[in-house]
Amino acid sequence: MNKEEILKIIQELNEKQNETICIETKTAKAGKPEKYYDTISSFSNTMGGIILFGIEEKKQKNETTFKVVGVYDANDLQKSITNLCSKEFEPVVRPEINIVNIDGKNIVAVRIDVLNQRSKPCYYKPKGLHNGSYIRVGDRDDNMTEYEIYKCISYRENVKDDLMPVVRATMKDFDEKILGKFIENAKTNKPKLSEFSDQEILLNFGVLTEVEDKIFPTVAGIMVFGKYPQKFFPQWFVAAIVIPGFEIADLGEEGQRFDDNKRIEGNIPEMYEETIAFINRNMKVKVIISDKTGLRTDITQYPKDALREAISNMIIHRDYSQFKTGVYSMVTVYKDRIEFRNVGNLYGSNTIELLQTRKAMEVRNETIVKLLETLGGIIENRHTGISTMQKKMEMANLPEPIFSNEREDFVVTFYNGEYPELYPEELKEEQLDIEKTYEKTYEKILQFCVEERTAREIAEYCGYKGIDRFRRTYIKTLLEQGKIKMTIPTQPKNRNQKYIINN
C-alpha cells in the first residue's frame, strides 16, 4: 500500500467515524499491541482486510476520529507481525506488509487475504481451534460458533451430511410407491442397473448405507422417500405463516397474530407440494377476461415459477447436518412480501454473485439432488434457480428478488409491488456490496440517534419497514458494540423503549 491509499482509508474512517468489516486500526505508538491475533484470524476467515498500525482511534462525545500517530519501531513491529503469522496460526498466514511514512510518522499497513474455503478456519494456535477461530462481524472480531467451525471442517474433509445413517430407521420407513417409482426410473435411465438387485441400486444411489455390516437408510433416503421423516427429525419441517401486516408483530383487525398458520411435514416432495398449496391459497389472484376471445387468464400476486424455485431451494439445499436437527425452514407471507428462510447460509465457496450466473456451483446435498433428479417432478434445471427467480419477477414487472446471505441462514425475499413506498430500495445494494449497505445504515443510525428514538423511528428514517429484521440486523449490533444504548435498559422489551448514542 502507498501513502495515498492509506490517507484515503483514514479519510473514509473519519467520514464513517467507525472501523469497517475490512479495516482495523491499532495505535502501537508506545509498543506492540497486546492483541491483534483475533483480527488476523477474522480477516482470514471472512473477506480479508487491512490492519493499520500507527492510527489512533479517539472517541469524544458524539464524534470518533482517526489520527496518524506512528508506531514505536516499524522494523521491530514488522518482524513481530511476520513471526506471529508464520508461527502462531494454523494454517500459516502470509501477510503483505508495507511501511509508509506520513508526515514523519511510520505507518505499518498489513493486508490479510481471505483464505480459500478448504483452508478455513484460520485459528490462533495458543487458544486452540474452538477458542482461537474468529469471524469478522461489522467492525468487531467474534469467536466462530461450533457450527461455523464444523461447516469449514466438514467442507474441507468432504463430509456429506445427507449420507449419514439414520440408525433408528429401517426399510419399513420408506414409502414403497415412491421408492418403486425411483427404482423404475433409475433402471430406465441406466439400463445396466437392471443387472443389480433393488438393494444394490439403493446402496449405489445413497438411499441406503452400510455401517459395520449393517444396512441403514441415509438422511437423503429418509428425507426423499420416507413415510414420515419427522419421526426421526421432528424439527425438519416447514413453518408457514401469514402475517396480517408488514412485520412479525403486527396484529389483524380482530387481534389475530396469523391469518394462516401451518406446520408442513412429510418427505421433501410432500413438503414442496404442500408449501406451494399454502402460498397459492394465501396470495391474491387477478382474473382477466379477454375482450376478443372471452378466455380467462389468472395472474397471481407472485409468479408461480419463481415461487417453485424459492421453495425447492429452501427445502432441498437446507442444512441437514447434526447441528441443525432442531431448526425448521420458514415461509412468512406479509402484506408486501414473502420471505423464504433457508436453514444454513451459502454452501462452500458459493457467493450471491456466483448464484446469479449459470456457472457450475457447489451443492450442499448432492445425494438428495441426485435422488430427486432421478425421481423427477421437483428438480428440472440445474443451477438456474436464482436466475429463474430474477427473470420471472422481472417479467411480472415486480421488484427484483432480494438474496441475503446471513450468518447462519440464507433468505430470499419477493416483494409484490403493491406497496412501493415501503419497498427498501437500499436492500438491492446488499446483494452486491454487503459492507457498503451495512456501514451506510450504521452511520445513518448513529447520526439520527443523537436524540432518543424508537426502533420504528430509526427503521423508517433508514428506509426500512421490517422492524424486527432491522432490529436484529442493526440495532442489536450497535447495542452489542456499545455505540448506542437503551433509555430503559432494565426492560429491553418495554413499549416505550428508545435508543440514543452512547457517549
Regions found by a protein language model. Give the residues of each.
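Short amphipathic alpha-helical interaction segments
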Residues: K465-E480, K493
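Intrinsically disordered, low-complexity regulatory tails
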Residues: P91-M171, T325-V327, H383-S387, K391, ...
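Short helix-coil junctions and helix-kink-helix linkers
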Residues: R296, E457-D468
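Polybasic/polar functional segments that serve as interface/processing modules
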Residues: M1-A109, N116-R118, D305
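Active-site helix-to-loop segments that bind/position phosphate- or nucleotide-bearing substrates
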Residues: S133-T325, M330-D336, R341, Y347-M361, ...
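Short capping segments at the starts of secondary-structure elements
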Residues: F448-E457
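Flexible, glycine-/charge-rich segments associated with ATP-binding catalytic modules
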Residues: K231-V238, S349-T351, T357-E443, Q447, ...
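Short, cationic-aromatic polyanion-contact patches
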Residues: T487-N503
